[in-house]
């Protein structure tokens, strides 16, 4: 048994079988990918890795299985069948992230069939080939369970609540959020009132779903509000988005040299991590000169000029606004970023798909009295000339 100390959860135990996976090079690669990408350019202490986050998710996932079974009086055999798979799904769920995480997917790859969740599924198969199968792992369902818990691609397990613990596509209440909504603010230096313990301990299994006590409706809303606030004010901070735009331009310019799209589909993907930034920055290769110049601008804080931030509805509306307002700037020098800030359920209440215990009548459900989604646009001049 190995114990790893985590700043959020204390000592996390891994048995001998789990340690084989924990020590795999694909998992260790997560140490070379920052959890919050370029956020450290604005919040310097936000430099933690996806490895730390994945440890936390695996811990909460295992604990959640125990609590659900205890609260619901389910037989112990469920524990051995699902506990390992859920814990490993938590550990593996971010394996497919590329350099600087979402920038790599959203700007460079732009292919839903090769997104980080799908890459995580492929990497899980590679890891099991390398680690091999012991008696404990010999069942055919293990690999399939873990992959579907990370990112479901079939309807085979839609009615199995254990597949909603790591990635909950039904109502977005999952252990991925439970960890990063605690971990990220600690590293950024923000106070955060969100604690998932009450939600976890007031969760139950009912048929094919995880349901919750009505007494935690305010805690659930707090989770969605905290996520909304972090996305709007921190993760999508105007300077962070600007630097992400510049990094995206640098990576796209370097794509012919690194061939990101093809490499991301092969085992060579293991070599792609955040070190790509320093590789380009320190390179004398002429093929990377444009990319290097963009990164030098980031380093020297010679950033693209922000022209406008506001709400939008349609692309055509944005383009018309740009054409009418910035006639003195070359069309090729103007770029814009669109963002949606919501509570995980589009324009509707995040509680719409959350099921509560029906035999509780003494608690009123707490909801958000606000607009659930906001569409924003940021417009930039990449040449910094007017």
Outline where the language-model segments fall:
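Histidine-centered, transition-metal-coordinating active-site segments
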Residues: 1-87, 95-386
């Amino acid at each position: 048994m190995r114990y790893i100390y985590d700043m959020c959860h204390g000592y996390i135990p891994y048995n001998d079988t789990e340690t084989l996976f924990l020590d795999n090079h694909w998992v260790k690669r997560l140490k070379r990918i920052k959890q919050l990408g370029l956020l450290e350019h604005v919040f310097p202490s936000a430099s933690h890795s996806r490895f730390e986050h994945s440890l936390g998710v695996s811990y909460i996932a295992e604990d959640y299985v125990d609590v659900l079974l205890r609260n619901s009086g389910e037989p112990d055999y469920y524990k051995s069948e699902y506990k390992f798979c859920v814990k490993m799904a938590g550990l593996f769920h971010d394996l497919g992230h590329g350099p600087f995480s979402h920038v790599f997917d959203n700007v460079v790859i732009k292919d839903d069939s090769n997104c980080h969740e799908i890459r995580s599924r492929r990497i899980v198969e590679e890891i099991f080939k390398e680690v091999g199968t012991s008696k404990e792992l010999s069942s055919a369902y293990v690999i399939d369970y873990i992959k579907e818990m990370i990112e479901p691609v079939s309807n085979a397990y839609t009615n199995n609540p254990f597949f909603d613990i790591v990635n909950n596509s039904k109502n977005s209440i999952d252990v991925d959020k439970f960890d990063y909504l605690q971990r990220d603010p600690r590293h950024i230096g923000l106070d955060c009132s969100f604690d998932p313990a009450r939600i976890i301990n007031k969760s139950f299994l009912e048929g094919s779903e995880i349901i919750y006590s009505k007494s935690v409706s305010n805690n659930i809303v707090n989770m969605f509000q905290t996520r909304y606030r972090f996305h709007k004010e921190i993760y999508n901070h105007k300077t962070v988005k600007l630097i992400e735009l510049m990094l995206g331009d640098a990576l796209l310019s370097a794509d012919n040299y690194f061939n990101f799209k093809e490499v991301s589909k092969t085992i060579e993907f293991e070599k792609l991590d955040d070190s790509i930034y320093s590789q380009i920055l320190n390179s004398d290769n002429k093929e990377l000169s444009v990319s290097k110049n963009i990164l030098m601008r980031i380093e020297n804080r010679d950033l693209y000029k922000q022209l406008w931030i506001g709400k939008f509805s349609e692309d055509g509306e944005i383009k018309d606004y740009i054409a009418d307002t910035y006639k003195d700037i070359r069309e090729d020098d103007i770029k814009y970023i669109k963002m949606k800030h919501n509570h995980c359920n589009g324009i509707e209440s995040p509680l719409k798909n959350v099921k509560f215990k029906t035999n509780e009548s003494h608690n009123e459900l707490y909801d958000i009295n606000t607009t659930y989604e906001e569409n924003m646009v940021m417009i930039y001049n990449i040449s910094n000339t007017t």
